[in-house]
Curated annotation (Swiss-Prot):
Catalytic activity: (2E,6E,10E)-geranylgeranyl diphosphate = (+)-copalyl diphosphate
Lineage: Eukaryota, Fungi, Dikarya, Ascomycota, Pezizomycotina
Protein name: Copalyl diphosphate synthase
Motif (DXDD motif): 318-321
Annotated gene: PaDC2
SUPFAM superfamilies, sorted: Terpenoid cyclases/Protein prenyltransferases
One of the protein's GO biological processes: diterpenoid biosynthetic process
Recorded domain comment: The DXDD and DEXXE motifs are important for the catalytic activity.
Cofactor dependency: Mg(2+)
Annotated spans, Disordered: 685-721
Organism: Phomopsis amygdali
Enzyme Commission numbers on file: 5.5.1.12
Keyword Metal-binding attributed: yes
Length: 983
């Protein structure tokens, strides 16, 4: 790119600023300050000349200056837990300063302090009342929050905090503490708990952790060091010196404020350099003495500590800082082997952030994968590369909603690391540098993951060009989109991509001042903002936006067909659901859908053999119904859910084909035998009497009620069965097992599984009834008819009854609806509930109404679009009922279609009204505001709405164009081929 001197100067200046307060003993750190740690340091006392005094009064003064009018401490609060911990620790400091008169302290108005404490207590109560444990992401909060409440209650009996989340909080706390042993902290191996010793006051002997100090600090935590200094039996001058250095040289710069961690030498050095290098800055751009010093620090620590380092010298090693350092040194051409990283952090399915970690981190694994890909001999680490690639794809595929990580609250942070490392991975694959590392299926999954991780930020950009009005989040978004420009999947989206980058840069340029760049989105005990790191992301985004495109990647995974893509986009843009959307959004959803198609095609014969049917052209569009509906409202249901539903939709098309082209022919003259086959396959036992979450088997763990429908593994009296029977039974058994024994179904409640099994049975039986009802019409299919002559069904039921029962069941919507319900109930129900997707009677009734109106509507739309096809194939259509023949008059088929369209619109209005009432009932039952139950209920409703829109879209598109595969007309030829199968 053309040399941009101002940006280069800024980047070099940033590197120089990192060492502005560097100390050879303590290192450096620029993390923002936190009231939580400041409060703990303010509690340290020391006896001087026989009199106890507050050692750091400036810290307490800072707390007084920053208390809000509402009573809490709000600076830097980006999550509810921030306010709770900042306020709780500061309240403890206030109480101790008010009630400990014998300690020498600056003169304060005790009445003022008491008033401040009252306001702080009120604020804390309000914040605790709103706490939702299930959405709290900060590591260790379940230990630290109770540890803060205990001393407050001991300090003042009136400070007893009772709040809705206390019970679930204590349940998590007790479970974790039941595994804790003080001896763990007394050994030679450092543990992460050393960073939070204030949570173990009264539980450990502080004298026995003295050997874990690093230059006086307890794993770089001011609050943990303060707790140690307060509770060790002997005064520790090194720890006092450390705290004094932090107060003077950390981000507080002598104001009395301290951060949650100091120093962070390795963390900030490696993150800043890798961020700048990734964007395209070179070592020559950044050349200065400070760059040499940073590299010297990283290289020296990496060598001294044996190839695995922590966020500062001497601290517990973690894979993040180790991997980032390896990547930094590799870019600079330095030797940095990942062997020790692999030895220390590799687990069975992923890489741990640190030894003993329980919940794996996506970003840590992205960093580890990046370090391996930076090796000149990356293929040597093929097994580790494959392992991490599978893990990061699985992590993405299983994540519901926006991706989360435990080190940063912004979903774009894990996304940018994921996108960068997958682009590098695909690039090496296409250069032939990783032969045989990834199988074809994993490559398909990589392609989908990469595209979604790039597309969703493009969809989520705010109108003013930002992401969440955050300067750092906006930098992440820009970096993701600049990577997307290299991915060939986005070649047809270059215009919106470039415009989004331009608007993002314009927003970033409009922000100025230090405070505008302090985004408290990083996670420590409380959220923090690393100012220099934020600046590095902003500079990287600006540089990358101006850089020429790198080599294109992705062509080996998928090449978009230009003609077919545009044709489908134009078709679907006519649908009512999409008319208001920009065409590029539909094109993006179509590309995403096309990336699912190879995966579906790879498994298209897993269940049905697909004999004697036309080309399965529906595979080219089936995924689009799911991707488009998912993207339309930014629902972002998990990718695994999308794939499962695409596969179910494919099976539904195949089931229709199989029942018409195979089972319907083999059993044409004895349909009752086919009915009996289905009854044999899905035998009824008992009726559903009770709800309850299942544990694996077929019984409700609470009530003992058995399943009302059980599956048979083989046909009964097999010696008396014909080969035709066995063929059909085998295919339908494989189909029903795939659905009813799907992993997400196995963990659903008994009630939801019963309903699914019943609807599955009704679905299969409806195909038989449909075939019988169609028989008289199929005999007329080859008789020439004028277009204005209507075939009339001889069915004895009314159109109203037929379209709501047999007809609605036949299109698969009801059983698919209950498949979704099983998934939602299993995945998105509060722990301890019965696990039903719709727990209350009102929700169950209204959900059933939504389902039936949806199915009826879709069948009507289907019949509008497939009238000609049904006539050709002899299938019963809504328009064949006498009600429409009587209303045709002189207008013929068009009058009939208009009448059916009006009825379909009535059903659509009815489904929308039923869904609105279901949402109202759900809010009434589960609460309209915060809390785990209400949050999960809203999420279930969002995904149900997404499902309903997908069904609605099917109906709308059927009206525009019939997408089912045609069944061959020559039934004699079909029968001959089927007979050949048994010979």
């Amino acid at each position: 790119m053309e040399f941009d001197e101002p940006l280069v100067d800024e980047a070099r200046s940033l590197v120089q600023r990192t060492l502005q307060d560097y100390d050879d003993r303590y290192g450096f750190g620029t993390m923002s300050c936190a009231a939580y740690d400041t409060a703990w340091v303010s509690l340290v006392t020391k006896t001087v000349d026989g009199r106890k005094q507050w050692l750091f009064p400036e810290c307490f003064e800072f707390l007084l200056e920053t208390q809000s009018d509402a009573g809490g401490w709000e600076i830097g609060n980006s999550a509810p837990i921030d306010g709770i911990l900042n306020t709780a620790a500061s309240l403890l400091a206030l109480k101790r300063h008010v009630q400990t008169e014998q300690i020498i302290q600056p003169q304060h108005d005790h009445k003022d302090l008491a008033g401040r404490a009252e306001r702080a207590a009120a604020s804390l109560r309000a914040q605790l009342a709103a706490l939702d444990v299930s959405t709290t992401e900060h590591v260790g909060f379940e230990i630290i929050v109770p540890a803060m409440l205990d001393p407050l209650e001991a300090e003042d009996p009136s400070l007893v905090f009772d709040f809705p989340a206390r019970k679930p909080l204590m349940k998590i706390h007790d479970a974790k503490m039941s595994r804790f042993r003080p001896e763990y902290l007394y050994g030679k191996q450092p543990m992460t708990a050393l960073h939070s010793l204030e949570a173990f006051i009264g539980k450990i002997d502080f004298d026995k952790v003295r050997h874990h100090r690093t230059h006086g600090s307890m794993m770089g935590s001011p609050s943990s060091t303060a707790a140690y200094l307060m509770h060790a039996s002997q005064w520790d001058g090194d720890s006092e010196a450390y705290l004094r250095h932090v107060i003077k040289h950390a981000a507080g710069q002598g104001t009395g404020a301290v951060p949650s961690a100091f120093p962070s030498t390795h963390f900030e050095s490696s993150w800043i350099l890798t961020t700048l290098f990734r964007a395209g800055f070179s070592a020559s751009h950044l050349a200065c003495d400070e760059l040499n010093k940073l590299v010297e620090i990283l290289e020296g620590s990496f060598e001294k500590e044996g190839g695995a380092i922590g966020y500062a010298p001497g601290f517990q090693a973690d894979v993040d800082d180790t991997a980032k350092t390896i990547s930094t040194l590799a870019v600079l051409g330095r030797d940095a082997t990942p062997r020790q990283m692999i030895k220390v952090f590799e687990a069975n399915t992923h890489f741990r952030t640190y030894p003993g970690e329980r919940d794996p981190s996506l970003t840590a694994n992205c960093n580890a994968l990046s370090a391996l890909l930076h090796q000149p001999d990356a293929a040597m680490y093929g097994s580790q590369i494959q392992k991490i690639t599978k893990f990061v794809c699985d992590y993405w595929w299983k994540s519901d909603g926006k991706i989360k990580d435990k080190w940063n609250t912004c979903y774009l942070y894990p996304s940018v690391l994921l996108v960068e490392v997958l682009v590098d991975l695909v690039s090496l694959l296409e250069q032939g540098k990783l032969p045989d590392v990834l199988d074809q299926e994993l490559q398909y999954r990589v392609a989908i993951t990469l595209f979604q991780a790039c597309l969703r930020p493009l969809l989520d950009q705010d109108a003013e060009g930002s992401w969440n009005k955050s300067i750092e989040a906006t930098a992440y978004g820009i970096l993701i989109l600049t990577e997307a420009r290299r991915v060939c999947f986005f070649d047809r989206l270059s215009e919106p991509l470039n415009e989004a980058i331009r608007r993002g840069i314009a927003f970033a340029d409009s922000m100025s001042g230090t405070e505008a760049q302090l985004n408290y989105i990083w996670i420590e005990k409380v959220s923090y903002a690393p100012a220099l790191l934020t600046k590095s992301y902003l500079l990287a985004a600006r540089w990358a936006a101006k850089s020429p495109l790198g080599a294109s990647v992705g062509s080996s995974l998928w090449t978009p067909p230009r003609e077919g893509l545009d044709k489908h986009v134009r078709l679907f843009h006519q649908a009512e659901l999409f008319r208001s959307l920009p065409e590029w959004e539909l094109r993006a959803s179509m590309i995403e859908a096309a990336l699912f198609t190879p995966l579906l095609r790879a498994h298209r014969l897993d269940v049905f053999p697909r004999q004697d049917v036309g080309e399965d052209k529906y595979l080219d569009v089936v995924p689009f119904f799911w991707t488009a509906a998912n993207n339309r409202d930014r629902t972002y249901a998990s990718t695994l859910f999308l794939y499962d539903m695409c596969f179910i939709a494919m099976l539904n098309f195949q089931l229709d084909e199989f029942m018409e082209a195979t089972a319907g022919i083999l059993f044409r003259d004895h349909m009752d035998d086919l009915r009996q086959l289905i009854h044999d396959l899905l035998a009824e036992k008992t009726s559903p009497k009770s709800s309850g979450r299942s544990s694996q088997g077929t019984k409700d763990a609470d009530s003992g009620i058995e399943e009302d429908v059980s599956m048979s593994d083989s046909a009964s009296d097999s010696q008396d069965r014909s080969p035709e029977y066995d063929l059909v039974f085998s295919a339908l058994s494989t189909f029903t097992k795939h659905v009813l024994q799907h992993p997400s179904i196995q963990s659903a409640s008994v009630w939801d599984r019963k309903l699914l099994a019943r609807e599955m049975k009704a679905y299969l039986l409806a195909h038989i009834q449909q075939a019988e009802d169609s028989t008289p019409l199929s005999e007329l299919k080859d008789v020439p008819q004028k277009t204005d002559v209507t075939r009339v069904s001889t069915s004895t039921t009314t159109f109203f009854n037929w379209v709501r029962t047999t007809s609605a069941d036949h299109i698969s919507c009801p059983y698919s609806f209950h498949f979704v319900a099983c998934h939602l109930g299993a995945a998105l129900s509060p722990k301890g509930s019965n696990g039903d997707c719709y727990p209350s009677a009102g929700e169950k009734f209204l959900a059933a109404a939504v389902c039936r109106h949806l199915a009826t509507m879709c069948r009507m739309y289907n019949d509008l679009g497939s009238a000609e096809r049904d006539s050709d194939e002899g299938n019963l259509n809504s328009l064949d009922f006498p009600e429409f023949a009587d209303s045709a008059g002189n207008g013929g088929i068009e009058i009939q279609k208009a009448a059916l369209l009006r009825l379909a619109e009535f059903e659509r209005d009815s489904y929308l009204e039923a869904f609105r009432r279901l949402q109202d009932e759900s809010n009434r039952v589960h609460g309209p505001a915060g809390g785990d139950e209400a949050r999960l209920s809203r999420r279930r409703m969002a995904i149900l709405e997404f499902f309903a829109q997908q069904v609605d879209l099917y109906g709308q598109v059927y009206v525009i164009r019939d997408i089912s595969a045609r069944i061959p007309k020559n039934e004699v030829e079909k029968k001959r081929k089927l007979d050949d199968a048994f010979n």
